[in-house]
Every structure is written in C-alpha cells, then in structure tokens.
C-alpha cells in the first residue's frame, strides 16, 4: 500500500517535515517514491509554512495512495491558501 506521509528533518527543537509518497512498509525516514512538498510548523518571518505540489498529490491519490490524517489536513490548508492567493 502506498501512503502520503511526513518525514522529519531539521534540527533539534526546530522540526521540518518533507511530505513524501512512500510504501507503508518503509521506515519513517527511509526510502520514498516521490517528494511532493514540505511543511515547516515553526516558520518565522518570510518563511513558507507549507509548499505542496497539489497536481502530484492528486495524481497519487487517484492512483490509490492514502494520505495520513495530518497530511490530509495540510492538503486542505494548502488548497485554501492557493485559492486565496489566486
């Protein structure tokens, strides 16, 4: 089964997450199929909080990938922010 989930990066006390498409059997920070964006929960100043390639996410969801609950919420947030920017 293929999932869209977060993988942690960044420094201690300053997390940064990549949003990836991966096989469910892979470790959290293990192999991935494709990186479709990032999430920065502690963005400051002019830093972006969410960057997401919605076309690729839509492609993977149509092909059976299941987003985790957190990623599903991030997709909704990214969709709203892109609609507001347009």
Curated annotation (Swiss-Prot):
Keywords: Ribonucleoprotein, Ribosomal protein
InterPro entries reported in the protein's UniProt record: Ribosomal_bS16, Ribosomal_bS16_CS, Ribosomal_bS16_dom_sf
Family matches, as HAMAP family: Ribosomal_bS16
Upper classification of the organism: Bacteria, Pseudomonadati, Pseudomonadota, Gammaproteobacteria, Lysobacterales
NCBIfam families for this protein: S16
UniProt xrefs under Pfam families: Ribosomal_S16
GO biological process terms held by the UniProt record: translation
The name this protein goes by in its record: Small ribosomal subunit protein bS16
Domain of life: Bacteria
GO cellular component entries: cytoplasm; small ribosomal subunit
Signal peptide start and end residues: none
MF annotations from Gene Ontology: structural constituent of ribosome
Family recorded in the similarity comment: Belongs to the bacterial ribosomal protein bS16 family.
């Amino acid at each position: 089964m293929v999932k869209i989930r977060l993988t942690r990066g960044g420094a201690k006390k300053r997390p940064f997450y990549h949003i990836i498409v991966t096989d469910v059997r892979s470790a959290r920070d293990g192999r991935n199929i494709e990186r479709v964006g990032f999430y920065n929960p502690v963005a400051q100043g002019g830093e972006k909080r969410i960057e997401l390639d919605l076309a690729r996410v839509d492609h993977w969801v149509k092909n059976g990938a299941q987003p985790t609950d957190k990623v599903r919420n991030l997709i909704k947030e990214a969709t709203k922010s892109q609609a507001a920017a347009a």
